[in-house]
Amino acid sequence: LEDGRIAVKLVFKHLVSAYQDGGDQQAREGMAMAAYYGGMAINQVNVGNVHAIAHQVGGKYGIPHGLANALILPHVLEYCREEAQSRLAELALVIGVGEAGEAEAQLAHKFIAAVRELRTEVGIPDRSDLIRREDHEALADAAIAEGMGYPVPRLLDEASTMAILSQITD
């Protein structure tokens, strides 16, 4: 799990700079290291619900995988917030958006808000006009089937997956 914490810290430190100035060597190196540590974390604990949904919308509509993940991430974090509260609270402290001693629920909320803000800073939209509502049921079924094998704090169900898809659909 330490690799994941390092990756998150590096992303929050370097992503905006790398996005705004592709020539910023330090930011690009920071993001390369974030990708490395993120990959190491995935190798240790696998992926989860975000990927299960992202694989479906990416495959169906040609949305690049990173963009699909970024589009979906805050919604799945919110869906799993209660079950993952202590880990989300820890990540809030890692990125410096909270103070030790704050309630875990508040810290978890601050971390999810920081993810949303970071996403906005790098031009990732809240919704996609490519995703069609008439496809939601099939996308949800496929995401649920894929997600069953992932070690997640909260399994997807049809209602929650349909709600997440609705939140990202124009």
PLM region spans:
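Buried hydrophobic positions in well-ordered alpha/beta secondary-structure cores of metabolic enzymes
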Residues: 31, 51, 65, 73, ...
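A short beta-alpha structural unit
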Residues: 8, 32-37, 41, 56-60, ...
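NAD(P)-dependent dehydrogenase/reductase Rossmann-like domain
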Residues: 22-24, 34, 45-46, 60-66, ...
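A generic structural signal for well-ordered alpha-helical segments enriched in polar/charged residues
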Residues: 13, 17, 59, 117-120, ...
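Carboxylate- and glycine-rich phosphate/diphosphate-binding segment that chelates Mg2+/Mn2+
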Residues: 1-45, 153, 159
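Residue-level detector of well-ordered alpha-helical segments, enriched
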Residues: 3, 7, 27-30, 49, ...
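Mobile late-domain/C-terminal helix-loop "cap" segments
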Residues: 74-170
